[in-house]
């Protein structure tokens, strides 16, 4: 019962009696909030669904408006830190990429930096084809540096889809291109504004559950 199941049950329950059966230990599927303690304070963290934007998620936005779900601005940030090295950066502007000043003199890092620019510009303009090649094969064809592959694009794909690196490299290139183009992730400037649910995603999960007519089993 992720957002698709819950929204379907929500609309059906307006005219019918609907019972929910959930095989997991929580309702909401990918929209799952947990509480952790940091510096002796409880912090609520979304571990699946986190951000959305107005361009790509119009139906979700309308659904939130209908249910008076409060939202707030967020960002789609990305950072990498390689264990036991000084190799780290974040993707928020040049100050983030070169937050570690030693990166300015790191040849491998500079290769990655220029590959990011080249790869993003080319991929954003590339027409989406039905070629049955993987992301890993696409990266090899374009002769991108190992540093770019291992410390940028594969970690980013792994983070977005919550998958190990070897699975990320097997992703169909057509799917990868479509997702990144639709979400503006190839844009070096003028990226879409991202939003998140105020007080985390369980806020809307609980509100929707309270409006579904029948019993809730899990």
Model-derived regions, located:
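N-terminal Rossmann-fold NAD(P) dinucleotide-binding loop
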Residues: 5
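Mobile amphipathic helical/loop "lid" adjacent to a hydrophobic cofactor/ligand pocket
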Residues: 54-178, 182
């Amino acid at each position: 019962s992720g957002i698709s199941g819950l929204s379907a049950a929500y609309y059906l329950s307006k005219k019918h009696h609907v019972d929910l059966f959930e095989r997991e230990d929580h309702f909401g599927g990918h929209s799952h909030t947990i509480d952790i303690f940091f510096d002796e304070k409880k912090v609520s963290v979304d571990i699946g669904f986190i951000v959305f934007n107005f361009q790509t998620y119009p139906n979700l936005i309308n659904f939130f408006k209908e249910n008076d779900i409060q939202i707030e601005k967020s960002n789609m940030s990305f950072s990498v830190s390689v264990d036991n090295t000084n190799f780290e950066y974040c993707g928020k502007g040049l100050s983030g990429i070169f937050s570690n000043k030693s990166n300015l003199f790191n040849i491998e890092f500079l290769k990655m930096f220029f590959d990011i620019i080249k790869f993003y510009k080319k991929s954003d303009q590339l027409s989406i084809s039905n070629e049955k090649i993987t992301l890993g094969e696409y990266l090899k064809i374009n002769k991108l540096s190992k540093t770019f592959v291992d410390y940028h694009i594969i970690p980013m794909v792994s983070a977005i889809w919550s998958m190990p690196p070897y699975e990320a490299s097997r992703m169909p290139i057509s799917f990868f291109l479509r997702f990144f183009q639709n979400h503006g992730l190839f844009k070096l400037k003028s990226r879409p504004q991202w939003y998140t649910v105020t007080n985390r995603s369980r806020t809307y999960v609980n509100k929707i559950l309270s409006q579904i007519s029948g019993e809730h089993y899990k």
